[in-house]
């Protein structure tokens, strides 16, 4: 992390399974076991996804979401369900377009062994919301609101089974507890963090008829403290 950048440029990248480039900004995903955990990190929960929508990428229709003691990780199935894909975050664009049989074969070869992988570290998470399904209008799709280097970034996923208010309450407990463990001063946000950690926070009604959980404390102080903790346990 540099003095100039405390938050991510983007929320994911398309790479080969097992790639370990820029580990603070992007997760490493193993083809068989899923995300590679960092030293001291524990896996808490995972579920299958039926839809993944991230700015800068085509919508993906299968993957998994993982929650650990440090981050929320999203990974697609092997990246072979579309003919076009892109990536954000300073690693350049990856484009595969197929118009003929030959170009389709070349594109397929380029996609082989690749996966979309992204994570939201808890120190970047502004909040999250349950949104109404576009067809049934029932609550279920999950939107993560993430502080990015250039502003707020949204990632939206749909789970199988659906995400619930009980699950969101649990996620609030995990994120708030991790944030408070950093030992920084959250000022007026301290009380709400305590409510989230205790599971007693009442979510807000959103403008589209969903429910929202705002997590106070995202900022320079929190990001630096979390990065120092990560570097202490992860860097050689």
Across the structure, where does each feature detected by a protein language model lie?
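Acidic, Ser/Thr- and proline-rich intrinsically disordered linker/docking segments
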Residues: 2-9, 73-236
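Intrinsically disordered, low-complexity, compositionally biased regions/tails
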Residues: 14-16, 22, 44, 102, ...
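A broad, low-specificity signal marking well-ordered, structured residues that form hydrophobic/aromatic
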Residues: 43, 65, 142-144
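The phosphoinositide-binding surface of pleckstrin homology
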Residues: 31-60
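Alpha-helical interaction segments
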Residues: 14-16, 34-36, 157-160, 220
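Polybasic, Ser/Thr-rich intrinsically disordered tails and inter-domain linkers
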Residues: 1-34
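Polybasic phosphoinositide-binding surfaces of eukaryotic membrane-targeting domains
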Residues: 56-83
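Compositionally biased, intrinsically disordered low-complexity regions enriched in proline and serine
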Residues: 25-27, 46, 228
């Amino acid at each position: 992390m540099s003095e100039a950048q405390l938050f991510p440029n983007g929320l994911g990248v398309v790479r080969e399974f097992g790639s370990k480039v820029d580990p603070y900004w992007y997760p490493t995903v193993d083809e068989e076991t899923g995300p590679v955990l960092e030293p001291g990190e524990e896996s808490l929960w995972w579920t299958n996804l039926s839809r993944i929508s991230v700015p800068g990428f085509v919508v993906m229709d299968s993957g998994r979401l993982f929650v650990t003691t440090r981050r929320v990780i999203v990974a697609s199935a092997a990246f072979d369900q579309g003919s076009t894909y892109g990536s954000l975050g300073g690693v350049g664009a990856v484009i595969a377009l197929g118009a003929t049989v030959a170009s389709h074969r070349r594109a397929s070869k380029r996609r082989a062994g690749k996966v979309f992988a992204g994570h939201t570290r808890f120190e970047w998470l502004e909040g999250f919301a349950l949104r109404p399904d576009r067809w049934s209008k029932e609550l279920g799709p999950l939107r993560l609101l993430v502080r990015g280097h250039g502003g707020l970034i949204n990632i939206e996923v749909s789970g199988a089974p659906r995400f619930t208010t009980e699950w969101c309450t649990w996620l609030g407990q995990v994120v708030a507890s991790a944030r408070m463990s950093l030992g920084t001063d959250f000022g007026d946000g301290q009380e709400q963090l305590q409510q989230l950690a205790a599971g007693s926070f009442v979510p807000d009604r959103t403008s589209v008829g969903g429910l929202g959980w705002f997590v106070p404390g995202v900022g320079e102080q929190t990001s630096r403290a979390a990065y120092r903790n990560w570097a202490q346990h992860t860097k050689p």
